[in-house]
Amino acid sequence: MKRLCIIVCCFLLAWGLAGCGNDEKKVLRVGTTANFPPFEYMKPNSDMYIGFDIDLMKNLASLMGYDEVEFVNVEFQKLIDGLETKKYYAVISGLAITPEREARVAFTKPYITDGLTIVLPVGTKLPNEAASLRRKRVAVESSSIAFDWVMKNTNHNNIVVTESTEEAIKAVIDNKADCMVVSKLSVAYLLANGFSDSVRFAGDNILFADEIAIAVNKDNKELLQKFNVELDKYCTSASYRNLCRTYFGSMK
């Protein structure tokens, strides 16, 4: 009888420890700005994060052994601040690699290439080049690569600064701006989802190409290496190609 009690106690102890282990999920906390479709945005009438970057990060995290990704929604201009103070382990938010950002954070290998383009009202014409923006009211999202490019290539007095790409489009539609400079992948999605009757691309070319990557804290070299190992494999997979088709319509 005593032996049976010992066996039962051992079983209960083992079961309890197993239960504790299951409760301790390995969670990857990631900063993002969820107002940049199709990269990251909120599902309508929901608190669910969706988008290309969201799915990409979940897939990478799973490959790296994480049980869950916890996304932290932060204003775009404060994303790197939060990474430096370690509020999260990584940032994914359509973030282009720039020398200024590289001085503060470490970037993974790029996972997609994007580019800037001019968007203008339907029925108007404008060459898709920097010279076209002279004396034009140009809408652009604050703290973005587009903002930096516009500041260097246009009259600063004519810039209409917005908090999102969608706000910039609305500024053009409402005649608060003559045109906008924006991520081509992002605006292509918006044009396909409700804005094609109002605005259009100025041309098929791009003004400036940029590479998009995940940012991590400079001292977290282990996490950076893990991301790069999985990106090398994932970005050549069928899953990645399907993800691109889902959000961009074709392989980029």
Where would I find each of the regions flagged by the language model?
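Ligand-binding cleft/hinge of the Venus flytrap
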Residues: M42-S46, M57-D67, A130, S143-S164, ...
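A conserved helix-loop-strand patch within extracytoplasmic ligand-binding domains
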Residues: Y66, L95-I97, K109-N155
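A ligand-binding cleft/hinge motif common to bilobed small-molecule-binding domains
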Residues: K78, G94-R104, K152, I173, ...
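Extended ligand-binding regions for polar small-molecule ligands
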Residues: I54-M64, T124, A131-S132, K136-R137, ...
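Short helix-initiation/N-cap motifs at beta->coil->alpha
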Residues: V69-D81, K125-L126, I145, V160-D174
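C-terminal motif of bacterial Sec signal peptides marking the signal peptidase cleavage site
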Residues: G16-G19
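Extracytoplasmic small-molecule ligand-binding "clamshell" domains
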Residues: E24-G94
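Periplasmic-binding protein-like
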Residues: A34, I112-L120, K184, A188-D232, ...
